[in-house]
Amino acid sequence: MTKAPQLPDGLVVVVKSDCPTCVVVQPVIDRLGAHVVSEDDDAGLETSYLLDVDTVPTLIRVVDGVEVERTVGWRRPEWERISGTEGLGEDLPPYRPGCGARAVDPAFSSELAVRFGGSRMRSRRVELAELEDEMEALFDRGWTDGLPVVPPTEARVLRMLEGTTRSPDDVVAVVPPDLVECTVEKVAINAVLAGCKPEYLPVVLAAVEAACTDEFNMHGLLATTWFSGPLVVVNGPIAREIGMNSGINAMGQGNRANATIGRALQLVVRNVGGGRPGEVDRATLGNPGKYTFCFAEDEDGSPFPPLSTMHGLDAGADAVTLFAGAGVQGVVDQLSRTPESLALSLAAALRVVAHPKLAIAFDAMLVLSPEHGRVFREAEWDRDRLLAELGELLTLPGAEL
């Protein structure tokens, strides 16, 4: 880490021009003859960062080149005590809060951390030629899913890591098919590539952990010739906090969180684990959901408890559920007004998933639209009753299998 610059003995004030408090205390600063560090220029911004200033104005007293004490904002008693000068700013109120320092502004802090903070990222750096197009370079190196990605600069990755309290060196999972240890830092890099915001990172980390369990069997999902890929359903308050879509077009395009969280998972599997099409990924045709397939459950509008409660979690817990999804198959029933009738339509559609005679060879996730969900809510059917009804309707004679 770059050392803080040597400060002159006496009083030092860190300010910025667009802070109203800094403006009103300027006559006080002039009276004290303090050394001014302005965040408006690069040198001052560097000094502010290295002095760990988070609020301006910050008044610092320096003795023999060493900081002795400081105060932030405008507090007349504190300024008078530190400076040893009475009667400061008598035309000002005794107290006025300061402003957030530019050095801690997310627009600057990540770049400052790269330049002066002694960042110790472990991932290999890739240097590009001056005239090399960074977007094309990522395509050329095979680090994309076929769509453009966001170049993962060190500043962007550090900003992404601010979305979690976990250490960048923590191993999140061993990613198939190459069984490579994947750290929080590696997940963050791929989250940047995917276009995630830092607040999405906890969901991406959870999805990566879930995908790399033996129960989910990501290696098997890659190796199959079937259409399927990982589908992510998000439950809990975090879905709303990060702006996920659980309503109209929830499985489609248009929502950044839905699109980039699922994409980040796929990029981790591809770039860290080596799960690339034509290699271990043997899908004959694939499906568009292998770019990204992620949405939130509409917990408020659902006739049933959250999906996550089926796996032992309490309602209201933040959670991700993964499923090997092969694509979307619609169910049309605009006539049923009873749950029994609607269950018949659902069962008929479920029976033909993949092939009507292969009843136990394929799984399905049933996602109800609000209109169909309302039928079960008004009849007070719970999830268990619907599952039992579907089980009865899908029990077939052996001759039909």
Set out the residue ranges of the language-model regions.
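Short active-site neighborhood of thiol/selenol oxidoreductases, capturing the structured segment around
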Residues: 5-20, 29
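Non-transmembrane, aqueous-exposed alpha-helical and coiled segments at domain scale
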Residues: 113-401
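Structural motif
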Residues: 14-18, 41, 369
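Iron-sulfur (Fe-S) cluster-binding modules
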Residues: 89-122, 129
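The canonical Cys-X-X-Cys-His
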Residues: 19-22, 59
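Structural micro-motif
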Residues: 51-60
